[in-house]
Amino acid sequence: MDNVVDRHVFYISDGTAITAEVLGHAVMSQFPVTISSITLPFVENESRARAVKDQIDAIYQQTGVRPLVFYSIVLPEIRAIILQSEGFCQDIVQALVAPLQQEMKLDPTPIAHRTHGLNPGNLNKYDARIAAIDYTLAHDDGISLRNLDQAQVILLGVSRCGKTPTSLYLAMQFGIRAANYPFIADDMDNLVLPTSLKPLQHKLFGLTIDPERLAAIREERRENSRYASLRQCRMEVAEVEALYRKNQIPCLNSTNYSVEEIATKILDIMGLNRRMY
């Protein structure tokens, strides 16, 4: 497709708009366009809905191109206002609900905030996720080696290879208690698996990264330092990868993967239960 154009994309919801964003991004990623995203959560009353409609219309007037609108709104009167806008509107939930309704012979009972809201039925799961986040923060970057037996996975790797963001994503998105342990330059002269980790080898997962990418990341943090030199990065990566092989620790090269992809691959390789919240 040759005609690549910029498009304004709205993600609108009477809740958090997370569902609209996730599904909308998935759809838009199929097209070679540069988008300008506008997320508008908690559109719960007619006054706010009219303000949103005016915002959509204003962009259409300025650009002459219809904004794309992905929405998830329960109240019909709010939906009606959004549908009066100059945007190309897509109800992302109803597109799936309608055929399911026909297949299951059941009428849906839509309730605002059901997907990401708190209710008596999901309070225990929510508390477990918060506990996982607290645990992960307390065990980031080898801060604490206490209660490591409570971790569901322990990520290993050199500095700046993606351990912390991956650990936090596992905790926040899936409620996984993820600890992580760094191997630093001082470890490299005699790199061995720490004694505290040996009994937990079944929970260990190694991250590695291309030295060139690692050097570029470190250069942003400590410019022109030994820490960021390509020679140092090559040495550290080689030593850590040798450690993984020696101890038969499953590992993944994070260079070309997003945090979401890394986390999902870890869940799959380690056989951890995938729980969505």
Swiss-Prot record:
EC number, UniProt record:
2.7.11.33, 2.7.4.28
The kind of enzyme this is, by top-level EC class, is: transferase
- Its domain of life reads Bacteria
User: Where on this chain does ADP bind?
Assistant: 157-164
Q: Please give the catalytic activity noted in the UniProt record.
A: [pyruvate, water dikinase] + ADP = [pyruvate, water dikinase]-phosphate + AMP + H(+); [pyruvate, water dikinase]-phosphate + phosphate + H(+) = [pyruvate, water dikinase] + diphosphate
A Pfam family of this chain: Kinase-PPPase
**Keywords, in A-Z order:** Kinase, Nucleotide-binding, Serine/threonine-protein kinase, Transferase
List, in alphabetical order, the Gene Ontology terms for molecular function in this entry. Answer: ADP binding; ATP binding; phosphotransferase activity, phosphate group as acceptor; protein serine/threonine kinase activity
Function field: Bifunctional serine/threonine kinase and phosphorylase involved in the regulation of the phosphoenolpyruvate synthase (PEPS) by catalyzing its phosphorylation/dephosphorylation.
NCBIfam families recorded for this chain?
A: PRK05339.1
Similarity section? Belongs to the pyruvate, phosphate/water dikinase regulatory protein family. PSRP subfamily.
HAMAP family in alphabetical order: PSRP
Provide the protein name: Putative phosphoenolpyruvate synthase regulatory protein
> To which species is this protein native?
Citrobacter koseri (strain ATCC BAA-895 / CDC 4225-83 / SGSC4696)
